[in-house]
Amino acid sequence: MTVDFAEYTFKGRDGLDIFASRYELAEPKGIVLALHGMAEHRKRYEEFANILNEAGYSFYIHDHRGHGETALENNLPLGHFADKDGWEKIIGDVKNHLELIEKRNKNIEVPVFLFGHSMGSFVSRDYISRNPYDFSGALLSGAAQVKRTELFLLKFFIGLEKFFKGEKKKSTIVENLIFSSNNQSFNDTERPDDWLSSNSKATKKYYEDPRCGFNCTVKFYDDFYKGMKNTAYIANYNTIPENFPLIFLSGEKDPVGGKDIIKLADNYKKAGLKNVEYKLYPEARHELINEYNKEEFFEDVINWLDKKKNEQKKKEDKGVNEK
């Protein structure tokens, strides 16, 4: 197996250089485009990429605006999408990256799957509601269902910070509202981000990485709020085809989503989707790619990708035979 690894840039919807990595196979059986979470970066997914390469899948990932090299190499602050229309630009960047991936693989007919973690799961869900035929399926890790009362509180406190601070200042109130209680369920915490994983080595590495764990601006949360709102209502799922493959994967002790993914999956089923699954991992927290039982997670991802790829092939073969 030969992997063509490269770091590159592509243009975002407004011309901004978006920094990305590819782990590309010459003849993959499928392709995965990954969207990372908040206050982290694409290079944390290298092991995941290598695992999927070994299973026969090409892997692509980019640093969102306000994250990783997309922020730093453009001399832009970490934790700030854009001064205007940040969420729309994040969605547009995914579209541009997908178009580049399709162009690079134009002679290969294989399914393209979307993987989204945490904030990336919100981006993924909003994207597939808007562009339901762009991907062959989606895997969502560390996802959450934001309640209407939570949306109301977020909107109120974002407005409060906007009024007293302005949009470009780092948020304190909203930041605390979202994250301050995440460690409370655990007795073994040494660092503020230990809720991410029960693997202390992984959380230590995150804590010591200057490209992780940064505070975000008031405008960032204002943009993110739009994504949360777009994905909060069942009516917004109606654009997705009923047989679109979707799986939610969460640590049972994840304070962000946890067992709430059961209700989240049910909401998609209520919208008419028939190919929705979920799995909870006992004792696991937010970042399944860094948990002690990550091998089980990797195996589940590969098995799901293989299963959905084969289902799609059977469907295509049946269509050809019926003609």
Question: What is the predicted function of each stretch?
Answer:
Residues G37-E40, S118-M119, E252:
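Active-site glycine-rich loops that stabilize anionic/oxyanionic intermediates
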Residues F248-S250:
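Short beta-strand/loop motif that positions the catalytic acidic residue
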Residues P255-K263:
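Conserved alpha/beta-hydrolase "acid-adjacent" motif
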Residues E277-K323:
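Catalytic active-site module of serine/aspartate enzymes centered on a nucleophile-bearing elbow/loop
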Residues S124-R211:
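Alpha/beta-hydrolase-fold enzymes
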Residues M1-E24:
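N-terminal cap/lid segment of alpha/beta-hydrolase-fold proteins
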Residues A49-N75:
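Conserved alpha/beta-hydrolase
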Residues F81-E102:
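Alpha/beta-hydrolase active-site loop
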